Amino acid sequence: MAKLTVVIPYYQKEPGILRRALASVFAQTLEDFHVLVIDDESPYPIADELAGLAQEERERITVIRQPNGGPGGARNTGLDNVPADSDFVAFLDSDDVWTPDHLLNAYQSMTRFDADCYWASITGGDAFYYHFGVADLEKSETVTRLSESPLVVELPELQDVMLKNWSFLHMSCMVIGRKLFEKVRFEATLKLAAEDVLFFCDCVLASKRVVLCDAAGAVRGEGLNIFHSIDNDSPQFLKQQFNTWVALDTLEGRYRNRPKAMEAIRSYKHTARRQALWSQARRIKRRKLPQFDLLARWLWRDPRLIGSAAELAVGKLSR
């Protein structure tokens, strides 16, 4: 049996969240794993979360403490510390939980079909209505079925499909092989958004084969989630949209020879610009100054921001 390393970035403010995630790890039907928890200066102390674990469980966990680096930085620390005898890395966000067969399904699918990268489906409550399962891809995309129970598929045009809508992919359902965990890393500077999507794309580009499993691998939780904690009126919203634009701009350089992917990327970039500008218009309406420093940085990177501002102004005046 191959050994897996579980990488969990930890930054939470409430008790019991990490403990719940770890309980789902130790309930796995495949038991050949070690756990790396990266304490990213979590406000709620990790020692309290580990206190109730059995001794044999505690011995299978390595805690690495670091200055706060955001989710991508924490996962990079995990990837940099994967034991030499590990063949796979499975990611789990500390506010999510795995279903019992997640690691077993991943291991069997990746070894049987010689895949470097694997995703399972994810489930969750009404707050995560936008997620959809792997089986739903068959309604609109060309899918090759590899096995029926559980349903495992591959998409010949995965790169184009995921850039059109990546809501069937989630970090807590992702498992990667040695070829990827030895060389692919997160863009740690993107702390507020899109570091996961950029990592997904880099892994797909570096893989000889990617397989997708319809069986749910994880259930989404509702702990502290940096992306979802920022609403349109948050002071951090503009930076979040800029992070998104930077990630998309990076992807544009990766996919210049794929017209469908480029079309999707440019559409998302346009949306990021418009949402950013609307947020600044709302600040003005509330008699607050726009965030000129970050707008200037964005404009320096992306002169098309002026065109988007003009479009919004014309649209406002024509009403």
Swiss-Prot record:
GO molecular function per UniProt: glycosyltransferase activity
Keywords: Cell membrane, Exopolysaccharide synthesis, Glycosyltransferase, Membrane, Plasmid, Transferase
Location of the protein in the cell: Cell membrane
Record membrane topology: Peripheral membrane protein
Superkingdom of origin: Bacteria
rRNA processing among keywords: no
Associated pathway: Glycan metabolism; exopolysaccharide biosynthesis
InterPro entries tied to this protein: Glyco_trans_2-like (IPR001173), Glycosyltransf_2 (IPR050834), Nucleotide-diphossugar_trans (IPR029044)
Principal place of residence: membrane
One cellular component (GO) term of this entry: plasma membrane
Pfam families: Glycos_transf_2
Family statement drawn from the similarity comment of this UniProt entry: Belongs to the glycosyltransferase 2 family.
Name of the protein this chain belongs to: Succinoglycan biosynthesis protein ExoW
UniProt organism field: Rhizobium meliloti (strain 1021)
